[in-house]
Regions:
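Short amphipathic alpha helix immediately N-terminal
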Residues: 74-95
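Short alpha-helical "recognition helix" segments of helix-turn-helix
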Residues: 97-104
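Short cysteine-rich clusters marking metal-coordination/redox-active sites
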Residues: 27-32
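Short alpha-helical segments that sit at the start of domains
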Residues: 167-203
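C-terminal recognition-helix end and immediately following basic linker
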Residues: 39-69
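A short, conserved structural fragment
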Residues: 123-127, 234-244
C-alpha cells in the first residue's frame, strides 16, 4: 500500500499526527518515509526514538502537518483561496481585528462571520463523513476506486478511475506486462494518467537522476521517450532542476 492509500485510509487523529504505526515501523502519511521502531536515530548529537525522529522529519520537511495539508489542491481540501488564507491566519494565532487589517476584509465582525462559516463547514464535514462510513457498511456495489495522489494538482475527472478500469488499461497498453514495453502512447488523457503513474513505479523515490538516466529508463518503455518524459513532468510525476541537470520522482 503506497502512502497515498495510507493517507486516505488514515483516521483524523492519525492525519493530525502525520504518521501511523505499521508493524515495527513508523510511516509518514505525507511522503511515505519509514523509520524502524526499536532503533535509536542520531541527528546533530541528539538521539531520537522512531516516533520522535518522525516528528522531526515532518517539522523539517513541511513545517507542520497543517502547512502540508493547507498546501494541497483545493479539490482535495474543499477550500476556496479566501478560506485557505483565513485558516492560515487563524492558525498563526492572529485575532480578528489583526486579520481584518492584514486582509482588508470588511470589519472584525466580518471575520467572525467567516469563522462561523468555517465552523458550519466543519459540522457538515463530520455529518458527511459519518454518512459515508455508514454507507460503506451497506453499499456492496460500489466499485473499488484508485486513490488520488495526495500531491495531485488540477484534480479533475481524469482521476475518476476504478481499479477494474486501471487494470484493463494497463493490460491493453502493456500487452506483455507492466514491466514490458508500452504498445502506444496514442490514447485519451485519462488513460495517459494511468499509464504514466505505472511508468513512475520504475523510478526510485528519493533518488536523483541525470537526464541520460531518465532517458535510458524511459527508452526501455517506449521509443519516443522524450514525449513520455515531457508528459511525466507535465502531470507532476517527475520534477527537475530548471537547467535539466537533475530529475527526481515527485512525492505522490
Amino acid at each position: 500500500m503506497d502512502h497515498s492509500e495510507l493517507f486516505w485510509n488514515a483516521g483524523i487523529e492519525e492525519l493530525k499526527r502525520g504518521y501511523i504505526r505499521q508493524g515495527e515501523q513508523v510511516v509518514c502519511l505525507l511522503d511515505g518515509q519509514r523509520y524502524e521502531q526499536g532503533i535509536i536515530y542520531q541527528d546533530q548529537g541528539v538521539f531520537y526514538d522512531a516516533e520522535r525522529y518522525m516528528r522531526l522529519h515532518i517539522e523539517r520537511t513541511y513545517g507542520s502537518v497543517f502547512d502540508y495539508l493547507i498546501g494541497l489542491d483545493k479539490k482535495l481540501t474543499g477550500l476556496t483561496d479566501h478560506q485557505n488564507r483565513l485558516l492560515q491566519l487563524f492558525y498563526q494565532g492572529m485575532g480578528d481585528t489583526d486579520i481584518q487589517k492584514e486582509t482588508g476584509i470588511g470589519s472584525a465582525s466580518t471575520i467572525r462571520n467567516h469563522r462561523f462559516g468555517l465552523k458550519e463547514k466543519e459540522r457538515q464535514a463530520k455529518v458527511f463523513l459519518t454518512l459515508m462510513e455508514l454507507l460503506k457498511e451497506k453499499d456492496h456495489h460500489a466499485p473499488a476506486m484508485v486513490e488520488v495522489p495526495v500531491r495531485a494538482r488540477m484534480v479533475d475527472e481524469r482521476y475518476n478511475i476504478t481499479e477494474d478500469e486501471r487494470q484493463k488499461v494497463l493490460t491493453k497498453y502493456f500487452p506483455k506486462g507492466t514491466d514490458g514495453r508500452l504498445k502506444t502512447f496514442k490514447m485519451q488523457e485519462k488513460h495517459k494518467l494511468i499509464v504514466l503513474r505505472e511508468i513512475a513505479d520504475r523510478f526510485v523515490k528519493g533518488q536523483i537522476y541525470h537526464e541520460k538516466d531518465i532517458n535510458a529508463i524511459l527508452q526501455e518503455v517506449y521509443d519516443d521517450y522524450v514525449t513520455v518524459r515531457r508528459y511525466m513532468i507535465e502531470y507532476g510525476l517527475l520534477d527537475r532542476k530548471p537547467d535539466g541537470s537533475e530529475y527526481w520522482l515527485k512525492e505522490s
